[in-house]
Amino acid sequence: MTVKITGFADEIAPELTAQIAGLKGLGMSYVEMRGVDGENLIYHTDEKVEQIKKTLDDNGIRLSALGSPLGKILITDDFTPHFEEFKRAVEISHKMECPTIRMFSFYLPQESDPAAYEGEVFDRIGKFVDYASANDTLLLHENEKDIYGAMAPECKKLMDTFYGDHFKAIFDFANFVQCGQDTLEAYEMLKSYIAYIHVKDALKSDQSVVPAGYGDGNVAVILKRLSASGFDGFLSLE
């Protein structure tokens, strides 16, 4: 398995200079950029984005993806302003020379049946994918608690409908554990669609996040299966 290591440097520090120091100290040359200098990358001005890009370039660090919050609004919220944020994120991804964006499939009302909102979810995701396709951008869907794609069956429905050059899957061990989803079952269901891994683990007992391999995510087993499959994407440390 030939993989590249990346990670969320805003868990080192909020400031870009400290993030870069931490990454270089770990021998890392990629970052999945989320928060930087006080807010998510997609909310910065063009001038600030250019400054961030130059600083990263000067230090030999590249983006593996934009760790955006896109799709992290209620499915009942107004989509129009959110879609404008999405278009801005696509623009920034190209400015950063990394047209790859982590995103989600919308929070659902508490204790609701995902099927009840499937039509609206798919309509919104379809608009994202159409725009991404027209603008040569890859969207990476992350399984996450309380969204439509929290469990493997719903993630597979999304992939069966939208998977392609512009829509692929992130596999997050801890998020599946925290949702009560068996990760081995999820992996077998989604393995054909996975392009990116979030290396994070959790305990079923209390849902606490623990170092990879110390929880119930079957991290070692799944990474071995990925290796055997020829996976060559990013492993992102979180």
Residue positions per predicted region:
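Short acidic/histidine-rich active-site segments
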Residues: 234-238
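Active-site acidic/histidine proton-transfer and metal-coordination neighborhood
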Residues: 14-21, 25, 55-58, 74-169, ...
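Boundary/entry segment of secreted carbohydrate-active catalytic domains
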Residues: 1-14
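A short, Lys/Arg-enriched amphipathic alpha-helix followed by its capping loop at the start of a domain
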Residues: 2-5, 22-28
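Acidic/histidine-rich catalytic cores of soluble enzymes
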Residues: 5, 30-33, 63-66, 127-216, ...
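Glycine-rich, proline-tolerant flexible connector loops at the mouths of alpha/beta enzymes
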Residues: 32-56, 106-112, 207
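Short, conserved active-site loops that position catalytic residues or coordinate cofactors/metal ions
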Residues: 26-37, 64-70, 104-105
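A structural motif
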Residues: 28, 33, 61, 93, ...
